[in-house]
Amino acid sequence: MTSIRTSNCASEGRRLTILYMTQTGTSSDLALRISRQAQRKRFHVTIADVCSYDPTDLVSESLMLFLVSTTGQGEFPTTSRPFWNFLLRKGIPEDILEDVTFAAFGLGDSTYPRFCWPVRLLSRRLRGLGAKELVEHGEGDDMHYLGLEGELGPWMNRFWRKLDELCPLEAGVREVGRDELLPPSVTVTKVETEEGRLKEKHDGRDALGRHLEDQGWSISILDKNQRMTATDHFQDVRLLEFVRLNQTDVEEDKRQIGENEEISRGSASALDGISIQTYRPGDILCLHPINDAASVTEMLSRLDLDADTLVSLAGSTIPSTVPQSPAHMSVRDLLTHHLDFTSVPTNSFFEQIRLFSPTGSQEREKLDEYCGIFPEEELAKGANPQDGIDEMYEYAQRPRRTIKEVLDEFKSVQVPLAYIADVLPWIKPREFSIASAPPANSEREKRVSEEPHAIQLSVAMVKYKTRLRKARTGLCTRWLSSLPLGSRVPVVIKPGYLTLPPAQAPLILIGPGTGCAPLRSLVIDRLSNSTLARSEIHLFLGFRYRTKDYLFQHDWQHLQQSYANQFHLHTAFSRDGEAKTYVQDLIVKPDNAHVLWEAITERNAWIVVAGASGKMPEQVRGAFESIARSQGGMDEEQAKRFMDALERQRRWQEECWG
């Protein structure tokens, strides 16, 4: 196993810039994986999130790869929109990027109507500015049985083939072999000083929280963690309530931090509590889960790492939630707060760990096969690399084995500390739609409350059995379940994807299951605000049982009684009777269909669908197409075009999640 310096990996003139647009971190992980492949081909590689990239630098680039995630209804990730808006500016010369060659790969979910639209738009716009497309853009589909890999693998083969033709290696220069170890993308440095150990001991109480404060997060208090579903119901859905720190807590924090310690703060300080002025219906609260102590101890033992060793991290691809040098932390804190070993391993994980298993061992041979690597003699006999990749899918991804379980089974794999942050993925913040409404009766920018304002979430706990019959609990679920009331929890509010309807527009809202959460925020905000409560609201909710999982039941019934002339509640319970009834069945009932059609065509109603992605949004859309046919006299094609027009006007919106 040979280690190669980055400077020795690249040939002069071979430069590739990889820009990624991400919402949850998937495209940034993919950027790292592709950068390693590019380094083996002797490219100088630069990786950047477009939110930190100056778009005026595009004219200086020669070869670029864009990795584009899809959010909302076929939209660019939130942090990528300034970059996209820059490209749309009027007056940009049509040949300004004539010296740029690019390729683009999109990440999306084909159950959405606007599957991978951002990558299509970006590709077209870059060509419109004179850039040359190396290979037709690719579209990775989460719904493929192999996930994104179903399209990524074949597309990357085409990409590298074209790139090799465009930029052939110089005579006598070879690619870096697949069995040679590249330098890590994240530098992990041991901190040996006694001063460092003392500082670690001082900061250890809440180092993560303080760092997140510097990044714009706030510290909240968990005030409620209450089960909403019946104890005998299969799904545990929790009502979580977070409130800002009171003044006593603020003063205590100031005292513990120290009057002379200078601390930089982000846009929302923890000492100010949750900034209630900054959110509106449809917005998102982010939580940062951590690993439990017992699991961390097991992982430390498996990796044979000293928990108390202090390290500092450095690298351009480290997420903002992770402190970099000169800040440092113990290895235990690194595994507790930042590295995820409970997730399902990706192809990239196997590509990494195979290099840390002894060459010639049975485990190394199996790991090679999982990566589609076979000896020449096996290939000559007809071995198919895709068969090995499919076998990896059946071993790891289909039964949802965790990274820890894979490492426990492949005992020969010994990952050194220097590579630990390359092999294990980062813990990603979890996003939840806010279920509570901001203080009403004032404009958003004037919403200020002297009393602590509670932000509420409706969160389904992730607990299931794998195909191997193993009980599995999600990382965030395990963390939330262990939090006692009164815990200090870092949070940050992000803008949602909904375009809020105008005050005079009627609302038609569809929210099965936990999809009712963002709709609750919207409904309460509309009804409790005298300047907004002008038009009718039709709310369609779907649950299994009236007595077991009817979320926010008393709230809906109270609103129905208090606003009987405006608020119209329709509920479907799919398991209460012999015939299963779903929200789409209620929508097409003749009486409802007539009222809804009038609201849409005569009063410009807006429709919002919230909940799980997959078949539900498609079936609900089909129900409205059915109304267009039955009430509007349209044929099938006209009904589809009618719904497409509503979507273009933002009068049809989906707030759905996987």
Swiss-Prot record:
NADP(+) binds at residues 514, 574-575, 580-584. FMN binds at residues 22-27, 69-72, 107-116, 142. GO terms for cellular component: cytosol; mitochondrion. It catalyses: 2 oxidized [2Fe-2S]-[protein] + NADPH = 2 reduced [2Fe-2S]-[protein] + NADP(+) + H(+). Keywords: Cytoplasm, FAD, Flavoprotein, FMN, Mitochondrion, NADP, Oxidoreductase. FAD binds at residues 400, 430-433, 474-477, 657. It comes from the Eukaryota. Residues 215-502 form the FAD-binding FR-type domain. Its main location: cytoplasm. It holds the Pfam family NAD_binding_1. Interacts with DRE2; as part of the cytosolic iron-sulfur (Fe-S) protein assembly (CIA) machinery. This is NADPH-dependent diflavin oxidoreductase 1. It comes from Mycosarcoma maydis (Corn smut fungus). The lineage of its organism: Eukaryota, Fungi, Dikarya, Basidiomycota, Ustilaginomycotina.
